[in-house]
Amino acid sequence: MARKCEICGKSPATGNTVAKSKVTTRRVWKPNLQKIRVVTDEGTVRRMYVCTKCLKSGKVQKA
């Protein structure tokens, strides 16, 4: 599974975790992806990985 929203293309973001002592370690923020059944533009139904922001904003029509 690619950790990427199939609608908006949101993918994992990287950065640092900064401790109180200012020691930094790399970390990853992963998008909240849900595997749902979606009605496509052609009218067919398929399963897609969609982030919750796209679900809430109504960018996809659930089947």
Curated annotation (Swiss-Prot):
Kindly name one Pfam family recorded for this protein.
Answer: Ribosomal_L28
Task: Fetch the Gene3D superfamilies from UniProt.
Answer: 2.20.150.30, Ribosomal protein L28/L24
Keywords on this record? Ribonucleoprotein, Ribosomal protein
User: PANTHER family from the entry?
Assistant: 50S RIBOSOMAL PROTEIN L28, LARGE RIBOSOMAL SUBUNIT PROTEIN BL28A
Q: Which GO terms describe its biological process?
A: translation
**Protein's recorded name:** Large ribosomal subunit protein bL28
Any Gene Ontology CC annotation: ribosome
- Which top-rank group of organisms is this from? Bacteria
As for family, the record states: Belongs to the bacterial ribosomal protein bL28 family.
Q: Name one GO molecular function term.
A: structural constituent of ribosome
